[in-house]
Design a protein with these regions (language model features):
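Cleavable N-terminal export/targeting peptides
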Residues: 1-60
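Gram-negative and organellar
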Residues: 37-421
Length: 421
């Protein structure tokens, strides 16, 4: 008979695969978080924080790579430290410091992040962020992000926990100004293998969002799936869930979701992940009628050659807004091409479109705002000293808003240097 300690800390292959599915396809919960829509080019991306015990390959990920097995220079017993310093320089125009006011600025971002792995089941990441603006219409800021991820298994159950925190400030499209936002997110995942074909995915989520001088909210939700594995690399699921949103200065909301999901690895080179259904929202005050919306999330990955990767992602969600008495209907599509050149250079090209419709959560006759956002990103990078990366980048962002003062066009060029142990 196994001891309780061994049962709780040992990952067999079946439970590891179940937990990985629950963690890595969790984005099919169709994120309802308010979208800050930062105008700036993407900043530091922390290294993968998935604990080693859960780093089995995701069979739906065509782009999965074999984990590195290099010696760990900063390892003491069960503790492994992975610093990931980062620097970015941007020369940007079209940055909104207020409605009808787009300006130019040089932005420098410095981060001294560190990832701590505790044993094989827990990973904790912390990244302080310093942003310096040459234009005095913006404030230099200190921000920070942190995340914790862990998991274990017990008999036919695989259990996971994730916690994240962010406190950042940047020019955003939604507010047409530099806006400080704070976010706390907690997720509890449980997956149960009923038999060789059927399984359950259970999730509880808590999200606290706030924005200085704008609306804030707290949300609690669940989305649960019944999965059936028809054959290897193909499964289908039915899901349902719901939640409650407590708004600081807008009507509170209840909502329900009903979805279907398909995961299909058609070949070693292509995969399809698709989820969709309907969401119903009720406003608990203000007199607005309930909203019934189609929602979906989809990703196609295609790798025709070892050095070429192509993906397309689309989604439609409904989320709370930082603007008072508003929710947003968000529909978007993004395509990304990653190409290795001459064996050492990596070219990444991506473009996207997002339609954001602001819907009143109170009974009013005023017209609603609509934003059409277009983005294009180009980045050429090269590795150095095995663990370092240097890249030059360009970003074009354009927002055509139906509300006066919120439209802009921004061009950004720069470079970034990162190093990950």
């Amino acid at each position: 008979m196994k001891s309780k300690k061994n049962v709780l800390t040992h990952f067999n292959d079946k439970n590891t695969r179940v937990l990985i599915r629950a963690l890595l396809v969790g984005f099919f919960a169709l994120d309802r978080q308010a979208q800050a829509q930062s105008i700036l080019a993407p900043g530091p991306q922390p290294p993968t924080e998935t604990p080693p015990a859960m780093q089995q390959a995701n069979e739906m990920d065509v782009f999965a790579t074999v984990p590195q097995t290099e010696a760990e220079p900063l390892k003491w017993g069960p503790l492994t430290l992975r610093p990931h310093p980062y620097y970015q320089f941007l020369d940007a125009d079209g940055l909104q410091s207020g409605t009808n006011n787009s300006v130019h600025s040089v932005i420098q971002t410095i981060s001294a992040g560190v990832l701590l792995q505790v044993g094989s089941h827990w990973a904790l990441d912390y990244s302080p962020l310093w942003l310096f603006y040459s234009n005095r219409e913006f404030s230099n800021t200190f921000g920070q992000t942190a995340s914790l991820m862990g998991g274990t298994s017990y008999k036919d159950w695989a259990l996971g926990l994730s916690q994240s925190y962010s406190d950042t400030s940047s020019p955003t499209a939604a507010t047409a100004s530099q806006t400080r936002t704070t976010s706390y997110a907690t997720a509890l995942n449980g997956s149960y293998a009923m038999n060789s074909k059927m399984s359950l995915d259970l999730t509880l989520n808590q999200q606290f969002e706030s924005a200085d001088q704008f609306s804030s909210y707290n949300e609690w939700s669940t989305l649960d799936w019944l999965n059936y594995q028809f054959w290897p690399r193909f499964s289908a699921s039915l899901g349902m869930g719901g939640g409650y949103v407590n708004e600081s200065s807008s009507p509170d909301i209840t909502f329900q979701q009903f979805q279907g999901r398909i995961l299909w690895r058609a070949s070693d080179k292509i995969s399809l992940q698709l989820a969709g259904g309907v969401e119903v929202l009720q406003f608990l005050s203000g007199g607005a009628a309930p909203l019934v919306n189609p929602i979906f999330g989809a990703t196609i990955q295609y790798q025709p050659f070892e050095q070429t990767r192509f993906s397309v992602t689309g989604s439609r969600t409904v989320s709370s807004s930082y603007l008072q008495n508003q929710v947003t209907e968000n529909t978007g599509v993004t395509a990304d091409l990653n190409q290795r050149l001459l064996g050492k250079l990596f070219l990444d090209l991506s473009g996207g479109y997002q339609l954001v419709k602001y819907v009143s959560s109170v009974n009013t006759s005023s017209s609603s705002r609509q934003d059409d956002l277009y983005t294009f990103n180009a980045q050429l990078s090269r590795a150095f000293l095995k663990r370092g990366t240097i890249a030059v980048l360009y970003q074009l962002s354009e927002d055509n808003s139906s509300q006066a003062g919120y439209s802009f066009t921004s061009h950004q060029v720069g470079f970034q240097i990162s190093y990950t142990y």
